[in-house]
């Protein structure tokens, strides 16, 4: 039996690349967003707020990234899971959870290494920006 466990975390270098990829995509959509990238336990690694992004986007981006990292699920899917299983948000006892679309877990070699959250657009737009950013990881890794 092992006395310790090993965890993997996304690096700042990759977190900043994800942040920029999300911003680049938001720009093509004509959006101003906030982007947060957290490690696998929900601690902030990188954050950016585009000019003219609404202030509420700051908290929602961070909350979505945190939720995706802590649950290991897309935040939209996590909400569906909770509803289908009749789990109340208060029973989770975590006030940082943000159960709206726009947060995705970051996986590397099938391990959860972090979460990305976008705030400032609609849930669908935020999720799209996060998804495009994650797809860019493959491009950066070549």
PLM segments and residue spans:
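Flexible, solvent-exposed loop/hinge segments and secondary-structure transition points
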Residues: 1-142
